Amino acid sequence: MLYLPKKLFLFFFSCIVVIVNYNNSDFVNAANSIGFVNAANSIGLNYGLLGDNLPSPSKVITLYKSIDITKIRIFDPNTEVLNALRGHRDIAVTVGVRDQDLAALSASEEAVKGWFATNIEPYLSDINIAFITVGNEVIPGPIGPQVLPVMQSLTNLVKSRNLPISISTVVAMWNLEQSYPPSAGMFTSQAREQLVPVLKLLSQTNSPILVKIYPYFSYASDPSSIRLDYATFNTEAIVVQDGSLGYSNMFDAIFDAFVWAMEKEGVKDLPMVVSETGWPSAGNGNITTPDIAGTYNRNFVKHIASGKGTPKRPNKGIDGFLFATFNENQKPVGTEQNFGLYNPNDMKPIYNLF
């Protein structure tokens, strides 16, 4: 997860103009203190590996089991992680295709078959692989056009094998040229060129698009103009009125702006999975504290668990993944290193989630 300033500007401008050695008991204790035990079934966790002090994958999987996490997302087919997941079919795994592999894979179906045989096939009998994501926020961009052919090849492959694996991609909100009010949501011209064909393929296969939604970045761009309670699900009052639809939190507004943009391109009722959301606990002064991060993530969990959906899609449950399991010290210095729920050294929670 890395946001480039130029792309941040394009999205946030439209947003802010208007919005005034461990044993099992150790793991269980950690689980109870972070609070996921009672609400995890709707929530997944991103499992990043950009750190030199991370616990072993086997310890991480034990942690996930102890806190009832049943969905995880990994960014590439890491063999150590996948081997640790063997036998844990109660955990649905989303596996990413690395961005740097897209060029070679987009060249031919044979290349995709080779990738699948190496990275997925050896684990099919032992691991519940639910999703393969092709690229991580590369649409729109120079390698964006490589996503669709790889998705098509993987879709053909899993269909021919009758495998229950969904093929999708992960996109960020800079695909939106306009996002406020939500009903004005529309894609950029480059997104229409690169993303819309992907969305239409997903409609045909009834597979969701995975989207990153980070109210934190909108808030951080202008904290004096955007209400913190609106950004953190911490008010029930309507802050943004969009025709007949009222919004009490920024997450729903961003989500629905993307829904509106899809509908304007003739893509209706396509499911959306939140591939990432979260709030850093440090790295940007007093707007990134454990208290604020805990508030956002607690309220996000409650929002997802409620099943109430968004104003545009009421009573339609949302699947979501929190970012991230651990603070990762090899990510860029600042907030990027501080999105984790746990410290990697002692595996203790950074804040209580409930």
Swiss-Prot record:
Xref: PROSITE patterns: GLYCOSYL_HYDROL_F17 (PS00587)
Molecular function GO labels: glucan endo-1,3-beta-D-glucosidase activity; glucan exo-1,3-beta-glucosidase activity
Residues carrying covalently attached carbohydrate according to the record: 286
Coiled coil location: none
Catalytic residues identified in the record: 137 (proton donor), 276 (nucleophile)
GO BP annotation list: carbohydrate metabolic process; defense response
A Pfam family hit: Glyco_hydro_17
Enzyme class of the recorded protein, top EC level: hydrolase
Similarity comment: family membership: Belongs to the glycosyl hydrolase 17 family.
Function: May play a role in plant defense against pathogens.
PANTHER family: GLUCAN ENDO-1,3-BETA-GLUCOSIDASE BG1-RELATED-RELATED
Record's protein name: Probable glucan endo-1,3-beta-glucosidase BG5
